[in-house]
Amino acid sequence: EISACLVGSEMCIRDRGMTAAEASCRSGGTIIMCAECADGHGGEGFYKALRDCKSPAELYARQMATPQDKTAPDQWESQILARILMHHKVIVVSRPEMQKTIEDMKMQYAPNLDAALKAARYGSSKTLTVIPNGISVIIVNQ
């Protein structure tokens, strides 16, 4: 199962859109994000939390164990992405300058949608959900 979202001028805004894809994609499925990231990765703490963690699961467990009054600024952003990465492969289609940042943040880079679909092994037996403007979508499971 593959879900795709198109949102955001920076990586941290894409977390918000990715939650729509997360809700529509079964565990083990692939989420493809398409965005230029013209403003880079967003907050430095967001980037470093993912870059420096051993794994998304380790980061998520550590953040969940952090008392509410001790959370890092904007911790929620990296916490959401870590949660998503624990259950989904995430491929980010963006400009070439973002490849290292994307890979540092435990995601896979693709230069275009065709390459992302190939990396996701999308075939006739898979389903594809496209969520335009994912940041403003509410998924209702029925």
Give the ranges of each region predicted by the language model.
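Single conserved hydrophobic/aromatic residue that forms the stacking wall/gate
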Residues: 1-8, 12-13
